[in-house]
């Protein structure tokens, strides 16, 4: 999982989710796209 200051979709199957005030990107097709903000 990458932690970066700005997160966004990197492909069509990425989903943006908010959990406990943090923004996550999860991707089933390409798990390398997992990101977290903050």
UniProtKB/Swiss-Prot annotation:
It comes from the Bacteria. This is Large ribosomal subunit protein bL36. Keywords: Ribonucleoprotein, Ribosomal protein. GO terms for biological process: translation. The keyword Nucleus does not apply. InterPro entries: Ribosomal_bL36, Ribosomal_bL36_sp, Ribosomal_LSU_bL36. The gene is rpmJ. One of its GO terms (molecular function) is structural constituent of ribosome. Pfam families: Ribosomal_L36. PANTHER family: RIBOSOMAL PROTEIN. GO terms for cellular component: ribonucleoprotein complex; ribosome. Belongs to the bacterial ribosomal protein bL36 family.
């Amino acid at each position: 999982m990458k932690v970066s200051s700005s997160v966004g979709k990197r492909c069509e199957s990425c989903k943006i989710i908010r959990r406990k005030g943090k923004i996550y990107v999860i991707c089933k097709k390409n798990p390398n796209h997992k990101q977290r903000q903050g």
